[in-house]
Amino acid sequence: METTEGLLAKVNDIESKLPKLESSINNLRKENEMLRVELNKINENLQDIMALYEVVSNQINPFIGVSKITATSLEKLERLETEYKRLKKTVEELTNDLIILGSLYLHQLDINLDEIIEEVLEEEIIKSMSGEDTHDTKDNK
């Protein structure tokens, strides 16, 4: 009898613990699924990082040749530098041509630029000393 009563008590004890165990198992399954999702996200992020690493290392790695992207960029940069030098030279030549043409024009018309500058400066000095202001907005409506 005792053994039967003891066994019944143990069965009742197990039956009372069974819902708690089922609840714990369900919680563990949910946590396991959440961990699986997080691991998948980590795996995807790691794959993205590795792809980025490969792109960067292919462009910068000194142990491999110049990548196609870097070579193309260097080519474009060299072309831009050549074009810049050409344009700079052209601007310098045009500036020199303007100076020469301006000098010829002034010489042909017998214009003394130094005298003109001197006259304008004298006029401005006289105006400023007399109190006239050529930049006064009230008088220049």
Curated annotation (Swiss-Prot):
SUPFAM superfamilies registered for this protein in UniProt: Mitotic arrest deficient-like 1, Mad1 (SSF75704)
GO cellular component term, pick one: archaeal-type flagellum
TM region positions: none
Signal peptide per UniProt: none
Keywords from the named record: Archaeal flagellum
UniProt-annotated location(s): Archaeal flagellum
Origin: domain of life: Archaea
One Pfam family cited in the UniProt record for this chain: FlaC_arch
Record-stated family: To M.voltae FlaC.
Protein name according to UniProt: Putative flagella-related protein C
UniProt source species: Methanocaldococcus jannaschii (strain ATCC 43067 / DSM 2661 / JAL-1 / JCM 10045 / NBRC 100440) (Methanococcus jannaschii)
